């Protein structure tokens, strides 16, 4: 029975997702339905948490909008999430960055991870 469930879940997984981790700045394109039309809305912020559970994977993105912190949780393989783009890689030493909730301004900055190019 569990093999059938696993097979159905594997069919619904998105294959075109980029690899991202907590600390990365991402742009999530979300499908928003307004009346009878549908449009894409961008949500850009720092990934503060990631949960890897196959089809039930999720991640939380935090941004500052008009001086107010806004967090939004997304299901990774949801049809509502159109695309995920990584803008910046962050250098952090934690899996969950909940401490950023209490910080603002310069203390909430995250160092950028520099990727070495192999020659």
Curated annotation (Swiss-Prot):
Entry superkingdom: Bacteria
Protein name: Large ribosomal subunit protein bL19
Recorded coiled-coil stretches: none
Any single GO CC term annotated in Swiss-Prot or TrEMBL for this entry: cytosolic large ribosomal subunit
Assigned keywords, A-Z: Ribonucleoprotein, Ribosomal protein
Organism: Photobacterium profundum (strain SS9)
Protein encoded by which gene: rplS
Family: Belongs to the bacterial ribosomal protein bL19 family.
Key word Ribosomal protein present: yes
């Amino acid at each position: 029975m569990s093999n059938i469930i696993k097979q159905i879940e594997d069919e619904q997984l998105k294959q075109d997702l980029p690899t991202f981790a907590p600390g990365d700045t991402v742009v999530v394109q979300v499908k928003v339905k307004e009346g009878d039309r549908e449009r894409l809305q961008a949500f850009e912020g720092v990934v503060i948490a990631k949960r890897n559970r196959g089809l039930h994977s999720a991640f939380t993105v935090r941004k500052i909008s008009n001086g107010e912190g806004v967090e939004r949780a997304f299901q990774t393989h949801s049809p509502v999430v159109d695309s995920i783009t990584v803008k910046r890689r962050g250098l952090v030493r934690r899996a969950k960055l909940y401490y950023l909730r209490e910080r603002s301004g310069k203390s909430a900055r995250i160092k950028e991870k520099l990727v070495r190019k192999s020659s």
